[in-house]
Swiss-Prot record:
Keyword set, alphabetical order: Kinase, Nucleotide-binding, Serine/threonine-protein kinase, Transferase
Key word Ion transport present: no
Binding site for ADP: 157-164
UniProt protein name: Putative phosphoenolpyruvate synthase regulatory protein
NCBIfam families (alphabetical): PRK05339.1 (NF003742)
E.C. number(s) listed in UniProt: 2.7.11.33, 2.7.4.28
Reactions performed catalytically: [pyruvate, water dikinase] + ADP = [pyruvate, water dikinase]-phosphate + AMP + H(+); [pyruvate, water dikinase]-phosphate + phosphate + H(+) = [pyruvate, water dikinase] + diphosphate
Length: 277
């Protein structure tokens, strides 16, 4: 497709708009366009809905191109206002609900905030996720080696290879208690698996990264330092990868993967239960 154009994309919801964003991004990623995203959560009353409609219309007037609108709104009167806008509107939930309704012979009972809201039925799961986040923060970057037996996975790797963001994503998105342990330059002269980790080898997962990418990341943090030199990065990566092989620790090269992809691959390789919240 040759005609690549910029498009304004709205993600609108009477809740958090997370569902609209996730599904909308998935759809838009199929097209070679540069988008300008506008997320508008908690559109719960007619006054706010009219303000949103005016915002959509204003962009259409300025650009002459219809904004794309992905929405998830329960109240019909709010939906009606959004549908009066100059945007190309897509109800992302109803597109799936309608055929399911026909297949299951059941009428849906839509309730605002059901997907990401708190209710008596999901309070225990929510508390477990918060506990996982607290645990992960307390065990980031080898801060604490206490209660490591409570971790569901322990990520290993050199500095700046993606351990912390991956650990936090596992905790926040899936409620996984993820600890992580760094191997630093001082470890490299005699790199061995720490004694505290040996009994937990079944929970260990190694991250590695291309030295060139690692050097570029470190250069942003400590410019022109030994820490960021390509020679140092090559040495550290080689030593850590040798450690993984020696101890038969499953590992993944994070260079070309997003945090979401890394986390999902870890869940799959380690056989951890995938729980969505």
């Amino acid at each position: 497709m040759d005609n690549v154009v910029d498009r304004h994309v709205f993600y609108i919801s009477d809740g958090t708009a997370i569902t609209a964003e996730v599904l909308g991004h998935a759809v838009m990623s199929q097209f070679p366009v540069t988008i300008s995203s506008i997320t508008l959560p908690f559109v719960e009353n007619e006054s706010r809905a009219r303000a949103v409609k005016d915002q959509i219309d204003a962009i259409y007037q300025q650009t002459g191109v219809r904004p794309l609108v992905f929405y998830s709104i329960v109240l019909p009167e709010i939906r009606a206002i959004i549908l009066q806008s100059e945007g190309f509107c897509q109800d992302i939930v109803q597109a799936l609900v309608a055929p399911l309704q026909q297949e299951m012979k059941l009428d849906p009972t839509p309730i605002a905030h059901r997907t990401h809201g708190l209710n008596p039925g999901n309070l225990n799961k929510y508390d477990a996720r918060i506990a996982a986040i607290d645990y992960t923060l307390a065990h980031d970057d080898g801060i604490s080696l206490r209660n490591l037996d409570q971790a569901q996975v322990i990520l290993l790797g050199v500095s700046r290879c993606g351990k912390t963001p991956t650990s936090l994503y596992l905790a926040m998105q899936f409620g996984i208690r993820a600890a992580n342990y760094p191997f630093i330059a001082d470890d490299m002269d005699n790199l061995v698996l720490p004694t505290s980790l040996k009994p937990l080898q079944h929970k260990l997962f190694g991250l590695t990264i291309d030295p060139e990418r690692l050097a570029a990341i470190r250069e942003e943090r400590r410019e022109n330092s030994r820490y960021a030199s390509l020679r140092q990065c090559r040495m550290e990566v080689a030593e850590v990868e040798a450690l993984y092989r020696k101890n038969q620790i499953p590992c993944l090269n994070s260079t070309n993967y997003s945090v979401e992809e890394i986390a999902t691959k870890i869940l799959d390789i380690m056989g951890l239960n995938r729980r969505m919240y």
